[in-house]
């Protein structure tokens, strides 16, 4: 793979009904219904809305044989009205259900974490090598007959690993690690190869974007070592709704798409399924528009590890670089100096003149030729102002430069000025590649100047900015290159929206936390309560608890597993019943839905993590996720 130049990974083609995946085909878009699968009319109506929005596959939960058999009626209902969309059965816990679903769906998703292995209980299990091999044989004995049914019915298979539902067997041997998630997938892929079953798609998902990106990168590497080229389904599970869901999905999925990985995507939002499709389409179109871009002659830093990157070593300059949290720069060139009370930038670029009224706690950046050393202000230079930079005594300087202007003279100047922070600019169609090239070149030259990434847009909707900026920053964050972010938008968006997007990107990348984080699933036919209204009520009660992670899950498939990554969890336990978690420990079961939010607040209070709401938002409490 080329870090600096975009091209899609070559994969094998998989036939899924009349809509093939992988190979020369475009990146496919899909979603999943959240209606009960036995309700034929509701499923057909929702599937049509997904297709009308641009969805190319529709997935339905099939928790039992009756649901699997009803896929036939749903198929008939769609085909009879001209909708030929392939249906995907989503199966957990029951190989028998997968066998039945393979006769009616164009593709069946199985979860290695609960296909043969019992559901996750977080118990540490001890196996000898012989006992472990016997467990693998159990999988083969049950999986091969399923593959034979799929061959007979021309049904494709997705092997879908979820971070939240790894088996106790895998966890006991590999721990809660990317290596364990990859091996969980590879156990099944090796059987597919042995049985010459090639209509296979794979996915490895997590709500933690860092884990998701690292694991998919590792999976591709392991597959290449074993001569496999199966196509990838990408997604961030439990991404949430609104701004959070869009940014988190764009960051995780976009980072992988930018490296040419991914043949189909699902943006999992806790909203109506058809709302996912336009977001996914924008993301795919934005990434693939850079095909055949002008070549970027980048040089990879010798110590860079793509599979397990660490933060680039930089010299701290005041509160930038080193071990400091990444900073947020913002623009106020239009003279409007308002800031979001919860998301106040660390530095504001004011251009030619300092504003009459300044924000407390904010530093200001002025053009170097007008900077006079005023308190809390710092000079900004461009790559043509090196002589002026040489004579400036400021203890913090900002040097704006694109990669192609990183000449020997600029490098020499930076070596003489470790107090200079580089602001990387790019107008290249593949700005991810060009930003990467600049950061790598600094390391190649032995420079430890911090790097802030300047991203220039002209968007009129928050969603467009969230998708594009998230996708552009994802790989840079996960590669450990980001010491700061500077979003500049010339569209109709307010500064508050732009600033909130910048902070949201850093939080989604788990490098700076400034608000409550919600891990919420999109819901499916297993969800027996109104997920969207519940999320709204939980947010209303807890959105001021900055730095806290709260999971809101529709059912137990991933719920308990994802709770290990949350401080508190709200998980569906049956019709109208909720279970509450403190991390992965279930504290109280089967609470009536109408009492559950109040009980959640009581649990948070009992553990000393609750603060009463104040009339105005205070500065964000920030912490770095390790």
From Swiss-Prot:
Reactions accelerated catalytically: (2E)-4-hydroxy-3-methylbut-2-enyl diphosphate + oxidized [flavodoxin] + H2O + 2 H(+) = 2-C-methyl-D-erythritol 2,4-cyclic diphosphate + reduced [flavodoxin]
Q: How is the cofactor bound?
A: Binds 1 [4Fe-4S] cluster.
Q: Name one GO biological process term.
A: isopentenyl diphosphate biosynthetic process, methylerythritol 4-phosphate pathway
Q: Which UniProt keywords apply?
A: 4Fe-4S, Iron, Iron-sulfur, Isoprene biosynthesis, Metal-binding, Oxidoreductase
Q: Could you confirm whether the keyword 4Fe-4S appears in this record? A: yes
Which EC main class describes this enzyme? oxidoreductase
Q: Which cofactor does it need?
A: [4Fe-4S] cluster
- What residues bind [4Fe-4S] cluster, as annotated? 521, 524, 555, 562
Which HAMAP family is this protein grouped with? IspG
Q: Please give the name of this protein.
A: 4-hydroxy-3-methylbut-2-en-1-yl diphosphate synthase (flavodoxin)
From which organism does this entry originate?
Bacteroides fragilis (strain YCH46)
> Coding gene?
ispG
